[in-house]
């Protein structure tokens, strides 16, 4: 079974249908008409992951149709992914198929790329990885000029680093982000820059007021917006994202951001003085004069009180 080709020419119609669907959900709220920013139709996604399906002596990338979850869909090209990922896929697969130490019990391959050309590949196995695998993987990383991580149950081998570095251009500035394997990043890099630019335009400058951001991730919006506020108070629950955020603040030389590792429910409780937290012992919540709240919530949404 193979995947159907992407209909690039139909993208504008698909986008319009999606916009109308979303608008209909919020029709009772009397919101202004949405502003629509089209994406590239191909090569827009900076992350991709595939099962590696073994068929006799050959392995290939595979995905699964929810309607037929036991039947692998062979993926030879994936134009949805960034061109760097799409170009790398056959080169990497050829290397994997040519060396048993790489292909043996390999069941998943994950790609993380950036607009600025960095690439991280995670190879995930159903076996313990040894020194032989590490030596071959180091050669592979050098030949393909990529970062490689090997994973198996309770094992993670980082050959060099477990992150990529993005240099994101927004409104004439360049923002630097470490993006860690396993951490959330915006998958559409070009549209991410557009979203940040749009957010900056909406808030204007409020240098005498403060920003509250819920679920800030690695500082994707936090860093560009911090220049337009006196202070920023941000929350995040992922350890990986909090670590990346602190490192990204340093890389971008911003010092007016306080990140709290807590949920929106907990922060709301603290702001309402319903509960105290040791994590807030060093933070004077009363010193914040919040003018704007930014939230990109998790899929579960926000709690009612927040």
Roles of regions detected by a PLM:
Residues 2-106, 115:
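Extended interfacial segments that mediate partner engagement and assembly in macromolecular machines
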Residues 46, 119, 209:
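Nucleotide donor/acceptor-binding cores
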Residues 51-53, 112, 122-126:
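Short hydrophobic/aromatic beta-strand micro-patches
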Residues 57, 69-71, 117, 171-175, ...:
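Short acidic/polar mixed-charge low-complexity motifs
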Residues 128-306:
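Rossmann-like S-adenosyl-L-methionine
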